[in-house]
Amino acid sequence: MELNCDVQRKRKISDLRPIASIDTQLRIYYEHAEIGTDEVRMLFGQNISNSTVSRLKKLARAKMADMEIQYIFSRFCVNTEAAYAAWGIDVNDLERRKKKLAALKLLDA
């Protein structure tokens, strides 16, 4: 049986990975206690749909509930620490990688 190559597999939200640089990911993490749609788009790309942003926030809200974290500023935002945990963004790993890049003199000044 031949598969139709024109049919695209619907991507799961768990397949989505951040496209932002290490510096951008760390800057967002340390600058914002809660993040909204703008920051989510900075992390995952400006072209992601509103429904994808909503699904990412839903994952983060579930993690907030697990971690028993309350909203600080707005119910339209999600806690940054919980969001990064829900999305599989490891801040310690990012910092380690940034130090390695600096040691190899591969970081832009």
Regions found by a protein language model. Give the residues of each.
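Generic signal for short, ordered secondary-structure residues
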Residues: P18-A20, E39, A62-K63
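A detector for short, charged/polar N-terminal pre-domain segments
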Residues: V7-A33
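Major-groove DNA-recognition helix of helix-turn-helix-type DNA-binding domains
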Residues: F44-A85, I89-E95, L101-L106
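Polyanion-binding surface elements
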Residues: L26-T52
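Basic, low-complexity segments
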Residues: M1-Q8, D90-D93, K99, A109
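Coiled-coil-like amphipathic alpha-helices with heptad-repeat character
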Residues: N4-D6, K12, N50-T52
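Positively charged, low-complexity intrinsically disordered regions
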Residues: R9-K12, M42, R97
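Compositionally biased amphipathic helical and low-complexity segments enriched in hydrophobic
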Residues: N4, R17, R27, F44, ...
